[in-house]
A protein has these predicted regions:
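Conserved acyl-donor/pantetheine-binding loop and adjacent beta-alpha core of acyl/acetyltransferases
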Residues: 75-136, 142, 192-193
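Conserved GNAT acetyl-CoA-binding A-motif
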Residues: 128-130, 157-170
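Conserved acetyl-CoA-binding loop-helix of GNAT-fold acetyltransferases
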Residues: 137, 143-156, 180
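C-terminal "cap" of GNAT-fold acetyltransferases
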Residues: 168-172, 191-207
Length: 207
């Protein structure tokens, strides 16, 4: 089912979208400061593509927590709390692939990626919440309202169930954008090695 929001429209991500989800998010992030920090120079684009196939593509499709534009030039994926209406737990094969492959994807950077993830996990809201894992729009499709449209289904789940949304970002531009849809900075952080600035943002549910 396509959700029509005027222009643009968004729909739930499907299995057939996984390659393009990975391609879109890789294009968005390939030269980012985060990618340079998280992934070695050797094979960075291939590593990033595989990461997004697993974490954004297969995880989001299998759990029902991903939305895309019709042409998949923009993507939003979430991690939902256990038992959230309309979602499913990640299949065992997806969990196993993530656990097995993430250290290899990050290569020599895995230690700081893992340690930083632990810091972020400790800072997340204590109770059930929706976690915005990935949000990206290809440069050729920006300034069309895709990002805001893609966030609406996940935020609607939050508002219906009375749960907050949260995320972490590494650029101030992302902070400014998310503030426009109701997120606020909960705390400023940095990666475990001090090399990457991070902001944890939380959006309270709206009645």
């Amino acid at each position: 089912m396509t959700v029509h929001l005027g222009a643009p429209s968004v729909r739930p991500a499907e299995q057939r979208d996984v390659p393009r989800i990975a391609a879109t998010l890789t294009l968005v992030q390939a030269t980012s400061r985060w990618a340079r920090w998280a992934l070695p120079d050797d094979g960075r684009v291939q590593r990033l593509t595989r990461l997004h196939e697993l974490d954004a593509g297969h995880r989001a499709v299998s759990t029902g927590t991903g939305w895309v534009t019709e042409d998949v030039t923009a993507v939003a994926t979430w991690e939902a709390p256990d038992g959230a209406p309309g979602t499913r737990p990640p299949p065992e094969d997806v969990r196993a692939a993530l656990a097995q492959e993430l250290p290899h994807i990050s290569g020599s950077h895995w230690s700081r990626v893992r340690e930083t993830r632990e810091l972020v996990d400790a800072a997340r809201p204590a109770g059930p919440h929706w976690w915005l894992a990935h949000l990206g729009t290809r440069p050729s499709s920006r300034r069309r309202g895709y990002g805001t449209a893609l966030l609406r289904p996940g935020l609607a789940h939050c508002d219906t169930t009375g749960l907050p949304a949260a995320t972490v970002v590494s650029t101030w531009a992302a902070v400014r954008f998310l503030r426009r849809v109701g997120f606020e900075v909960d705390r400023a952080m940095e990666s475990s090695d001090g090399a990457l600035p991070l902001w944890l943002l939380v959006r309270p549910p709206r009645s």
